[in-house]
């Protein structure tokens, strides 16, 4: 007798990784999953429903969920049969990039409200049921910026560092209840949203920022960032494939990076526990040797660094 499908609740499915993951799980050939694909604004569900095709209403349902609202989370769980979630995928997130002096505290708080407290809110909601049943899997879409700081991404990186520390700590306790936590750590992901964001910040004023810092951001960081996305970036489909493997694993890993081409960029931090090697090298590459940085990024795009296909 086949096992009953596992209920998978995914946040942030209007586009990008969340959308691709929901569709891939819903089209699982063995029909192992019943996907609840959520988003804050149901007015944006059209792309997901089109991509889901015949799976819509069968192995995939769309629901409203604002991870920043206790009421919205409760309403969403009430719509799930039995209110029981077998796999929770914390994917909803927002970005923030730019010179620190030009960013408002309200914008910073919004990043933490969504990226960190939104994930915590969902976990608190599903954990009692998972503990009672002594089974469950919590997947967190983190980032390599949860492993290393990146210039002009201080607030976003801080939110991901918070997620990494929180869920690593929680993982120890939850093993006692046969509940697994997996932190999935993508590098740059090429989406329409990212392209628009880079264009918007390239002309933003960032009031309160000194001319030198603004010049560094526009003339050094933004070109390097575009080069990074072009040479090292993954598609949402590729990241989703890795997450599907993680969800289907008999013993899910605590951490899984999705892009081996990014590995050399985080190796410097591992090589020097003091952190000085990473900070000084990053500083020199961005501010003194930008041409060398661009050359290095192009080298990372060669086939020897391509992301492998993880075995089933």
Swiss-Prot record:
Catalytic activities: all-trans-retinol + NADP(+) = all-trans-retinal + NADPH + H(+)
Membrane protein topology class: Multi-pass membrane protein
TM annotation in the entry: 87-107, 138-158, 170-190
Compartment(s) of residence: Membrane
PROSITE patterns, A to Z: ADH_SHORT (PS00061)
Residues annotated as binding NADP(+): 9-18
GO cellular component terms listed in the entry, alphabetical order: cytosol; photoreceptor outer segment membrane
Active site: 156 (proton acceptor)
EC number of the protein: 1.1.1.300
GO molecular function: all-trans-retinol dehydrogenase (NAD+) activity; all-trans-retinol dehydrogenase (NADP+) activity; estradiol 17-beta-dehydrogenase [NAD(P)+] activity
GO terms classed as biological process: estrogen biosynthetic process; retinol metabolic process; visual perception
CDD domains: type1_17beta-HSD-like_SDR_c
Domain of life per record: Eukaryota
Keywords assigned by UniProt, alphabetized: Lipid metabolism, Membrane, NADP, Oxidoreductase, Sensory transduction, Transmembrane, Transmembrane helix, Vision
Ranges in a coiled coil: none
Function, as annotated: Retinol dehydrogenase with a clear preference for NADP. Converts all-trans-retinal to all-trans-retinol. May play a role in the regeneration of visual pigment at high light intensity.
Name of the featured protein: Retinol dehydrogenase 8
Gene field: RDH8
């Amino acid at each position: 007798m086949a096992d009953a499908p596992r209920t998978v609740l995914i946040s942030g499915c209007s586009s990008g990784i969340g959308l691709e993951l929901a569709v891939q799980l819903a089209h699982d050939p063995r029909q192992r999953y019943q996907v609840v694909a959520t988003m804050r604004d149901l007015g944006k569900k059209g792309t997901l429903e089109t991509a889901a095709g015949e799976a819509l209403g069968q192995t995939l349902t769309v629901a409203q969920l604002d991870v920043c609202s206790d009421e919205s989370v409760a309403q969403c769980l009430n719509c799930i049969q039995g209110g029981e979630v077998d796999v929770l995928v914390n994917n909803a997130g927002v970005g923030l990039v730019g010179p620190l002096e030009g960013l408002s505290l309200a914008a910073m708080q919004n990043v933490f409200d969504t990226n960190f407290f939104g994930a915590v809110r969902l976990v608190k909601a599903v954990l009692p049921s998972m503990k009672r049943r002594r089974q469950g899997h919590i997947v967190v879409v983190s980032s390599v910026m949860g492993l290393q700081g990146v210039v002009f991404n201080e607030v976003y990186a801080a939110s991901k560092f918070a997620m990494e520390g929180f869920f690593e700590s929680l993982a120890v306790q939850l093993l006692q209840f046969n509940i697994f936590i997996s932190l999935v750590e993508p590098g740059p992901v090429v989406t329409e949203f990212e392209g628009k964001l880079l264009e918007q910040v390239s002309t933003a004023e960032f009031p309160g920022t000194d001319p030198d810092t603004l010049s560094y951001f526009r003339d050094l960081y933004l070109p390097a960032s575009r080069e990074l996305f072009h040479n090292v970036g993954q598609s949402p489909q590729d990241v989703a494939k890795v997450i599907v493997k993680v969800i289907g694993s008999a013993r899910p890993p605590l951490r899984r990076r999705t892009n081996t081409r990014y590995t050399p960029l985080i190796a410097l931090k591992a090589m020097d526990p003091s952190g000085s090697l990473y900070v000084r090298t990053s500083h020199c590459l961005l501010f003194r040797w930008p041409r060398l940085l661009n050359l290095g990024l192009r080298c990372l795009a060669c086939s020897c660094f391509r992301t492998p296909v993880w075995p089933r």
